[in-house]
């Protein structure tokens, strides 16, 4: 359970970071 929770949290953090980077580099609207 704890491992799954950590994995999901990691995925969410990674997705958010990618979105922020994309916004900074003008790759996203």
Swiss-Prot record:
Subcellular location: Plastid, Chloroplast thylakoid membrane
GO biological process: photosynthesis
Record Gene3D superfamilies: Chlorophyll a-b binding protein like
GO cellular component terms attached to this protein's record: chloroplast thylakoid membrane; photosystem I
Alphabetical UniProt keywords: Chloroplast, Membrane, Photosynthesis, Photosystem I, Plastid, Thylakoid, Transmembrane, Transmembrane helix
Signal peptide residues on this chain, from the entry's feature table: none
Membrane topology: Multi-pass membrane protein
Residue stretches spanning the membrane: 3-23
Family: Belongs to the PsaG/PsaK family.
Protein's recorded name: Photosystem I reaction center subunit psaK, chloroplastic
